Amino acid sequence: MLIQQLGRQDYVSVWQKMQDFTRQRGGAEDDQLWLVEHYPVYTQGQAGKAEHILNTGNIPVIQIDRGGQITYHGLGQAVIYPLLSLKAANIGIRRFVSLVEETTIALLQDYAVAAHARADAPGVYVADGRKIASLGFKVSRGCSYHGIAINVAMDLSPFLGINPCGLSGMKMAQLSEFVPEIDVDSVHKKWAELFSARWR
C-alpha cells in the first residue's frame, strides 16, 4: 500500500483526484493512503439535510458524493483517505468502517486518550461523548474513497455553524486538549502505521 503525503491542499482538487484515481485504478496493487490537511471548507454528504447547516459564514459549503451528513475540514485536522480495493480484500463496507474506527481508537490509546465508536453514529468519540473523528466513504467499482478526519490542533469554532454529521448539539473534541505538543504530521504517520498493520 502506497502512502502519499499531500500536505495542505484545497478540498475540491483532492476530491477530483480521488474520483479520477478510483475510476482508473486496478486491484490491491493500486491501494493507497492519502494524508492531507484541507483549507477551511464544509462538505455536505449525499444524505445531508439543509436543516443541519446553521451559520457557515464565509466558509464554502460543497455538496459531495460520500455518505453521511455535513462536516467541517480545516487546518490542524488530520485527514486520511484510504483508497482501497474492498473487493480484492474481500471485506464489506461495514467491516471496513469498523477497521477505520478501530485504528483511530488505537491511535488515541497510544496517546493515553480513551475513545470509542457508536453503533448509531459512525465516528470516534472521547469518554465525555464529544466527537474527535468524523468519517464518510464512497464505494465505486468495489473500491473505497473519501475517508476520516481527526481533529488534532485546530480552531473548532466552525463546527458551531453546523450540526456535525447531522447530530444536533454534538460537541467536538481535539487531540491537543489531551496532548498539548501534538501535530498533524505525527498523527498522520502513526495512523498510517497502525492501519497498514491491520490491512495486511
Curated annotation (Swiss-Prot):
Binding site for substrate: R66, G67, G68, Q69, I70, T71, Y72, H73, S134, L135, G136, G147, I148, A149
Keyword terms, alphabetized: Acyltransferase, Cytoplasm, Transferase
Key word Protein biosynthesis present: no
GO molecular function: lipoyl(octanoyl) transferase activity
Transferase as UniProt keyword: yes
Name of one Pfam family that matches: LplA-B_cat
Gene3D superfamilies recorded: Bira Bifunctional Protein, Domain 2
EC number(s) given by UniProt: 2.3.1.181
Record-annotated site: Lowers pKa of active site Cys: K131
Annotated catalytic residues: C165 (acyl-thioester intermediate)
Reaction catalysed by this enzyme: octanoyl-[ACP] + L-lysyl-[protein] = N(6)-octanoyl-L-lysyl-[protein] + holo-[ACP] + H(+)
Cellular component GO terms, alphabetical: cytoplasm
Swiss-Prot/TrEMBL GO biological process terms: protein modification process
InterPro entries for this protein: aa-tRNA-synth_II/BPL/LPL (IPR045864), BPL_LPL_catalytic (IPR004143), Octanoyltransferase (IPR000544), Octanoyltransferase_CS (IPR020605)
Described function: Catalyzes the transfer of endogenously produced octanoic acid from octanoyl-acyl-carrier-protein onto the lipoyl domains of lipoate-dependent enzymes. Lipoyl-ACP can also act as a substrate although octanoyl-ACP is likely to be the physiological substrate.
Family label: Belongs to the LipB family.
Note: In the reaction, the free carboxyl group of octanoic acid is attached via an amide linkage to the epsilon-amino group of a specific lysine residue of lipoyl domains of lipoate-dependent enzymes.
Protein name: Octanoyltransferase
Organism in which the protein naturally occurs: Dichelobacter nodosus (strain VCS1703A)
Lineage: Bacteria, Pseudomonadati, Pseudomonadota, Gammaproteobacteria, Cardiobacteriales
